[in-house]
């Protein structure tokens, strides 16, 4: 079974891409945010940033169990998915986005200034990409600034999974 993770700064198009790919590749879509909330894999809720503070170690244990028990190919969607150990992941897709477009997307979500700045900085500094590379993942970068050609992305993924 194959496992693809989709990571990137919030607002870069992870979920849209992951859901589209799960359909075209016939992979099972895993929504990590739902798992975090349903399984209460967080230490607290940060009121200021309006976000859960996630226990990444426990999240990885839950995701590893899902991967090991799965009889299907998986696409795991989360800005935290790149923390999974390399041995469980066949391909790591990192979504990137033009900073002006990302700012518009985050403003539509009504992010407060501090959270907005934090996410824009993370994108500018390539935090998710660098951390994915540090974790030795096989990385495919997808720019989601423009309309995506899912067929071309599917072909790229299939090629990468063969290598």
What kind of region is each of these model predictions?
Residues 9:
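P-loop (Walker A) phosphate-binding loop of NTP-binding proteins
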Residues 103-104, 108, 133-163:
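NTP-dependent small-molecule kinase module
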Residues 6:
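Hydrophobic anchor at the beta1->P-loop junction of P-loop NTPases
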Residues 44, 96-140:
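A glycine- and Lys/Arg-enriched "phosphate-lid" helix/loop adjacent to the NTP-binding pocket
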Residues 28-84:
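ATP-dependent small-molecule kinase phosphotransfer cores
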Residues 12:
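ATP-binding Walker
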Residues 15:
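Walker A/P-loop
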């Amino acid at each position: 079974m194959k496992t693809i993770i989709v990571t990137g700064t919030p607002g870069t198009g992870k979920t849209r891409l992951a859901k589209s790919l799960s359909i075209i590749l016939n992979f099972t879509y895993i929504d990590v945010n739902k798992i975090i909330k349903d399984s209460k894999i967080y230490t607290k809720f940060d009121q200021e940033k309006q976000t859960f503070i996630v226990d990444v170690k426990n999240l990885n244990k839950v995701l590893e169990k899902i991967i090991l028990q799965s009889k299907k190919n998986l696409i795991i969607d989360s800005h935290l998915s790149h923390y999974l150990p390399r041995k469980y992941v066949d391909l790591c897709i990192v979504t990137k986005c033009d900073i002006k477009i990302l700012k518009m997307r985050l403003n539509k979500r009504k992010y407060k200034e501090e959270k907005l700045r934090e996410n824009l900085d993370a994108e500018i500094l390539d935090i998710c990409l660098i951390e994915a590379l540090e974790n030795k993942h096989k990385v495919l970068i997808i720019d989601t600034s423009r309309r995506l050609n899912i067929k071309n992305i599917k072909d790229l993924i299939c090629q990468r999974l063969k290598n």
